[in-house]
Amino acid sequence: VLHGGMEFSDSCIINDDVIKAIEKCIPLGPLHNPANLMGIRACQAVMPNTPQVAVFDTAFHMTMPPKAYRYAIPTEYFKNDDIRRYGFHGTSHKYVARRTAELVGKKEFKMVNCHLGNGSSLSAIKDGKCMDTSMGLSPLAGVPMGTRSGDIDACVVQFICNKYGMSVDDCLTMLNKKSGMLALSGVSSDFRDLNDGAEAGNEDCQLALDKFAYEVAKYVGAYAAALNGIDVLTFTAGVGENDCVVRQMVCDYLGFLGVELDPELNKSRGKEMVISTPNSKVQVWVVPTNEELMIAQDTAELVNAAKQ
């Protein structure tokens, strides 16, 4: 389920109360939650005696402190409407945090996870718990993505709507579906196409890659400050796991943290491995995400516990 709002901080077995709470979150996830509910109800109709588990994309981020999740807007919008930072890709961030703890052999450490794909988000994680994340009330916030603008001055929306007679909904559709790498490059939202274009001398493709790496590195730097240093930097998802050019571009900004990539190790694609040098003050890992496994594990734990 995309959006658990402030109702859910963990996965849970679905019952009537859970369904009502998911319905309550529809204003926060208007595109996804209704579809999620359709699936839940269809399964209830076909398999009425089979337990169902809801795994929320926002749940992992519910450990953020107020200084990270509150927006500096009048308090009534938070109290009445639950407007705050929620974050997404939580199932992926949770999996990578757990798997990285196994790989480095300890539970207490500070890391930044870079989930980089067509949709991208970063999370600051301390001892396995999320302290901050780049997406916000919606997945539109944070770094620029395949077709999403990422962080943008709200007055841009006002300006475009006023000048071009565009509705707010249409403007948000533009920011979600026609912006990001697609808009900057004028070519594609696919990073493989951007790399090919940049190699062929397309300056707009190069700008898109430069902008992406720059913004990702800015978030890593900000989260290093928020965590008072980091021990591990992880890359995951389609771009993070497979695009050695983007990883190198991001890490080129992070020398001040003591990040040092091994150029040969960084050539790997889709493999679970360290790609930093032995001298790097921050371990840099590629950790392929496995959201399906995380969902299956949560489901098994809850269903087995319910049987006891």
Regions found by a protein language model. Give the residues of each.
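Adenine-nucleotide phosphate-binding core of ATP-dependent small-molecule kinases
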Residues: T173, G180-L184, F191-A226
